């Protein structure tokens, strides 16, 4: 969130459920504290988000689905930092929260272990990275996924959301092409504008970034969660020199963007209210 409305990145593979829970709880708190604000400004409700998400998931049922469809949320487990949010969202949607060892391929279909035996699963809402999804097809050391799951998926017998491979749009270099992609496929200009982005793989743009590195935010194209980036105006001389070497050695691994004035929200600290960036 920032002013004016622009996007700084796309998360299309497994965006954190932490933000979804915070969104719902924040709205509930705000409704209790400032009900007139929402009534006066006709703010759209979001409390039905979990059910809307479930509705969307059920709309992706495979052709093999029967009248009584089964949707589950696949979590890495209780040691994952977002496990509480996974449990919260599964509970709100009224679906089963499962780990990899709760699922099994039976007779060419994905099944969930229950007290009544195996039950066929039609849709898996995955909350783990693709590489851990199936040790037979991806990372063989993964103990979080389901052996053979991807084979069932390729045969069209189960839906995985978001689909494996959609994480390509998380790539920050891909982000810089999004306006052109939107126009190519829709014939329309995007409603939400991108932040200006320099692709360091292009020599002229790399030269600009190197000349202005102290003013820009440098991001690793495959990085996430604040890793692999440098904020020029607050960086030390050592950090700037380090990133300059990285840009020269592997320019294709980086993009650059201007620093932004992010939106803030008031929070309560031990010294009273203070603004914090969203």
What are these regions (language model features)?
Residues 17-278:
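Domain-scale recognition of functional cores that engage charged ligands
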């Amino acid at each position: 969130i920032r002013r004016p409305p622009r996007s700084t990145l796309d998360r299309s593979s497994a965006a954190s459920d932490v933000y979804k829970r915070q969104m719902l709880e924040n709205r509930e708190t705000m409704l209790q504290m400032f009900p007139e604000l929402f009534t006066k400004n006709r703010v759209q409700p979001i409390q039905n988000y979990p059910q809307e998400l479930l509705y969307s998931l059920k709309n992706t049922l495979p052709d093999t689905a029967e009248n009584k469809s089964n949707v589950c949320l696949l979590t890495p487990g209780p040691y994952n930092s977002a496990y509480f949010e996974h449990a919260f969202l599964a509970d709100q949607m009224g679906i089963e929260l499962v780990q990899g060892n709760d699922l099994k391929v039976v007779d060419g279909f994905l099944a969930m272990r229950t007290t009544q035996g195996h039950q066929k699963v039609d849709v898996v809402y995955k909350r783990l990275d693709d590489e851990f999804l199936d040790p037979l097809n991806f990372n063989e050391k993964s103990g979080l996924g389901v052996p053979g799951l991807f084979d069932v998926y390729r045969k069209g017998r189960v839906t995985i959301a978001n689909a494996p491979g959609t994480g390509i749009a998380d790539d920050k270099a891909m982000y810089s092409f999004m306006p052109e992609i939107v126009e190519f496929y829709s014939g329309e200009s995007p409603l939400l504008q991108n932040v200006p982005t320099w692709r360091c793989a292009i020599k002229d743009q790399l030269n600009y970034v190197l000349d202005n590195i102290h003013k820009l935010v440098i991001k690793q194209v495959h990085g996430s969660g604040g890793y692999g980036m440098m904020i020029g105006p607050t960086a030390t001389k050592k950090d700037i020199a380090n990133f300059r070497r990285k840009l020269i050695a592997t320019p294709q691994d980086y993009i650059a963007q201007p620093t932004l004035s992010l939106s803030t929200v008031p929070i309560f600290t031990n010294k009273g209210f203070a603004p914090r960036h969203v």
